[in-house]
Every structure is written in C-alpha cells, then in structure tokens.
C-alpha cells in the first residue's frame, strides 16, 4: 500500500477548499482517507493565517514512516508555506 499526503477538494463550484489528507494512492482524490492533517484555502491571500493550516507534528510523522508528499504539498514545504522545522 502506497500512502500519499495530498489535497482532497471540497467546497462549492468555483469556490474550492482543500483538505490536506493522508490517503492510499489507489483511492479517488476525494475518497476515503486515513487521516486529515489540515486544510488549504486558495481563495485567501497567501499572507492570511488561514491560507494553509497543517498539523506539522503529524505531517512529520507520516513523512518519517514513508508517506510520499504530492507535488503541491512538496511545493508548500519547499517554499516555507508549511514550515516543518518549527515543530
């Protein structure tokens, strides 16, 4: 079983809202997930405190046990939007 940390889409039409979830890679994008780690709201400016909110300790745990982050989650970490060094 390959586990991925990815975004699951929620919200209304033209008003997307995403949850950061840990899910089996074979499950549909918005399907069943193992754990919800936080959320991402692209409708807010990047400076807003609720643009991205993630449980960093759980994110670090899942990365340590071999879960793979998708491109978008990796980009958030690389750009410092999700700061995994603080926890």
From Swiss-Prot:
Family label: Belongs to the bacterial ribosomal protein bS16 family.
InterPro entries per record: Ribosomal_bS16 (IPR000307), Ribosomal_bS16_CS (IPR020592), Ribosomal_bS16_dom_sf (IPR023803)
Gene3D superfamilies with a match to the protein in the record: 3.30.1320.10
GO molecular function: structural constituent of ribosome
Gene Ontology process terms (BP): translation
Organism: Ehrlichia chaffeensis (strain ATCC CRL-10679 / Arkansas)
Keyword Ribosomal protein: yes
Protein's name in the database: Small ribosomal subunit protein bS16
Keywords noted in UniProt: Ribonucleoprotein, Ribosomal protein
SUPFAM superfamilies xrefs: Ribosomal protein S16 (SSF54565)
GO CC annotation, single: cytoplasm
């Amino acid at each position: 079983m390959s586990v991925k940390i990815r975004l699951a889409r929620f919200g209304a039409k033209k008003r997307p809202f995403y949850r950061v979830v840990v899910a089996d890679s074979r499950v549909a994008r918005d399907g069943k997930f193992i754990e919800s780690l936080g959320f991402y709201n692209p409708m807010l400016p990047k400076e807003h405190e609720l643009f991205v909110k993630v449980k960093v300790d759980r994110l670090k745990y899942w990365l340590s046990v071999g879960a793979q982050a998708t491109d978008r989650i990796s980009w958030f970490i690389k750009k410092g939007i999700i700061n995994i060094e603080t926890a």
